[in-house]
Amino acid sequence: MAFRAARIAFAWKATNPANTTIRQYIKETLEEAPEKISQTVKKATGKASKKIDENKDKSPQEMAENAKQSVKQTAKDAKDTDYQQKAKDAGKKIKEEFSQRSENVLEETRREGMNRDGGVKKE
């Protein structure tokens, strides 16, 4: 019976005149949604279309030359990078971090051992 009463109360509340404004608001927002989406798409494509327009003025040879230059610059940067030194530095950093963390863990276990057992016992 309670279930039926709840269904009837919900049905009456859904058709209540006080909720017509909510339904009207939902209906209006659903009608306005496609317009808002189209405006957002226009804004997004506006930015992209400006980039396309900028590239449209450049000749294919000029774009190819820019691509070649960027590839050369990337290759030069890769060649100039000292990977062995970077690997050594990374190894040192990892070792330092590991030793620091292990010291912290040892200190914590000592403190916990002292609190529990009344001190750290050597075996």
From Swiss-Prot:
Question: Which of UniProt's keywords are assigned here?
Answer: Mitochondrion
- Give a Gene Ontology cellular component term annotated to this protein: mitochondrion
Q: What is this protein called?
A: Uncharacterized protein C4F10.17
Q: Where is this region: Disordered?
A: 34-123
| Location within or outside the cell | Mitochondrion
Q: Where is the composition biased (Basic and acidic residues)?
A: 50-60, 74-100, 107-123
Q: Name one GO biological process term.
A: negative regulation of cell integrity MAPK cascade
